[in-house]
Amino acid sequence: MTTYEEFLKDAGNYRTVPVIESFSTDLLTPVQMFHSLKDEAVYMLESQEPESAWSNFSFIGLDPMVEIEETGRQFIVNDLERGDRLTLPTFKEAFEVTLGRLEVKIPDMDIPFKGGGVGYISYDAISDYEPVPRAPEEEVHIANYHLLFCRTLLVYNHRSKEIHIIHFARVDDDRDNAQIYEESMETIEHIRTRLLHDSDLSDLLLPTVLPMTSTFNLESNYRKEKFLGDVEKIKNYIEAGDILQAVLSQRFHKKTERSGFELYRVLRKVNPSPYMYYLKFNQLEVIGSSPERQLEVQDGNLEIHPIAGTRKRGATKEEDDRLARELLEDEKEIAEHRMLVDLARNDIGRVAEYGSVAVSEYMVIGRFSRVMHIISKVRGRLKAGVSPIDAFISSFPAGTLSGAPKVRAMQILRELEPTARNLYGGSILYLGFDGNIDSCITIRTMTLVDQNLYIQAGAGVVADSDPESEYQETINKASALEQTVHLTEKIFNDRNILKV
């Protein structure tokens, strides 16, 4: 626990000081914690990747104190706690001003995320950095950038069953430090009491056997004939030498009465992934389980994980191994993967120290719950004078969701795709108070706006692509998420299923 003496010492040097309380219990889960605090909770970040430090933790953000949102090509820093707003011309300036205003003492804890901005940057934000035409306006406006800086961060350690409550207390001249510390301790005690005394678990039950379905019942923004024709157009661009590859996508839609958190609870069970997230912004909810890192910046070290090449998981170890061998012998998949590794090297190379860029792992098989992929890891060391945000922008968006060469591919996609991509192909990320960044590519993700659910999926088109196969690939990818929607509706619309 943070003592008053420790708080007083830090309050003399910082504008925002973490007040921390930790306790152990084997009675709580992250889902219970979020449910108990659902009125204040705005995000949950999790991971199920054994090699990652993230897999030991779940992070829940409560009660935003500052948000950054893009509106009309301007960036609004909205200080929700102080009640004032600033307008700035760039995202980088908005973030740096926010860090300066908060001036946070970084918690001295061995956890991968120590507080900061959590949110998304949409694919369409690329028009702020590259000569890619802006996407047309849509009826439902979704900001290209939205970050939340929460007043309280809950950290759940899956291994030790320890829970940390980190409350970021802002020091000001209107109240004395004793009052600020006392109010912080009261807030922490209130949160702990609610966590430990919420005994209504009836809404948290899930069946042990999930009823699967093979139907596909989603509306698309693309007529099939146009999609097939656009695949041919991309192949013509490739033949003409404009590009090597482009990722053509279609967006699917359906209505649902289920909440985003209900969808997330089912998704985390049926499709555990390295990056799992539930984000809540006013009318928008984001639910996802992405397998692919966009960029990590950790103490000046850069890392990207290009993923390309997919096979289903085998029913037995023998079948699984056979499918993995087939994948590594597929010339089309290997060629695409090598191209994306080169893109990652170029992205990191623009912001890395000379000679520091290296491929630390090359074409290894990564196995997930339903599929396997070919994965590589590209690393580098951040160049002096280059900020972590500069590094992120250099890698954005991922080549795996755009194409190569990246800018020309995005220009062609903007010409062909009928609507804005919004979050699809962009990034879910945190920008830490400590300057670190971790981010994933926004794929295998659902967005929910006023009961309208959107799923988007793409296929990488190359010179020898078969249009029908590429179309079916997008259907297959979207079907995996539609299964989650169907299961969620089945479970929560018919609570009798819980008696199975």
Could you describe each region identified by the protein language model?
Residues 1-500:
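Extended alpha-helical targeting/anchoring segments
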